[in-house]
C-alpha cells in the first residue's frame, strides 16, 4: 500500500481534532477530511448556489484516484477555466 507523501498541500487539508486528557494535556489526531468537513472551513456567507458548486468540486477532487501533482494542476486549471466562463456568461 502506497503511503501519502507529506507535502504542504496534504498538511493543509489534514483535519486536526484536539482532545483533552484527564490530566489537562492536549492530544491531536490527524485524519483526512471528507467533503463535509472541508466545506465547514468555508465562510458561511456564500450563497446556496456557490456552496453547491464548491461541494461538487470538492467531491470531484476527493474522487480522484492517486493524483499526481501534475494531473491535479491540469484538472484544477480545466475546472477553473470552465467555472470562470460560466460566471462571465451568467
Curated annotation (Swiss-Prot):
Subcellular location field: Host mitochondrion inner membrane; Host nucleus; Host cytoplasm, Host cytosol
Alphabetized InterPro entries for the sequence: Flu_proapoptotic_PB1-F2
Keywords linked to the UniProt accession: Apoptosis, Host cytoplasm, Host membrane, Host mitochondrion, Host mitochondrion inner membrane, Host nucleus, Host-virus interaction, Inhibition of host innate immune response by virus, Inhibition of host MAVS by virus, Inhibition of host RLR pathway by virus, Membrane, Modulation of host cell apoptosis by virus, Viral immunoevasion
Any single GO CC term annotated in Swiss-Prot or TrEMBL for this entry: host cell nucleus
Acetylation found in the keyword field: no
Disordered: annotated segments: 1-30
Keyword flag Phosphoprotein: no
Note: Is not encoded in all strains, and seems to be dispensable for replication.
Subunit structure, interactors included: Oligomer. Interacts with human SLC25A6/ANT3 and VDAC1. Interacts with host MAVS.
Family as reported in the entry's similarity comment: Belongs to the influenza viruses PB1-F2 family.
Listed name of the protein: Protein PB1-F2
Organism from which the protein derives: Influenza A virus (strain A/Silky Chicken/Hong Kong/YU100/2002 H5N1 genotype X3)
Amino acid at each position: 500500500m502506497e503511503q501519502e507523501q507529506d507535502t504542504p498541500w496534504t498538511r493543509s487539508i489534514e483535519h486536526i481534532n484536539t482532545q483533552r486528557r484527564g490530566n489537562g494535556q492536549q492530544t491531536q489526531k490527524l485524519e483526512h477530511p471528507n467533503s463535509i468537513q472541508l466545506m465547514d472551513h468555508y465562510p458561511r456567507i456564500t450563497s446556496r448556489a456557490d456552496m453547491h458548486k464548491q461541494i461538487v468540486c470538492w467531491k470531484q477532487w476527493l474522487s480522484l484516484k492517486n493524483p499526481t501533482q501534475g494531473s491535479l494542476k491540469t484538472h484544477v486549471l480545466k475546472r477553473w477555466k470552465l467555472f470562470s466562463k460560466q460566471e462571465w456568461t451568467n
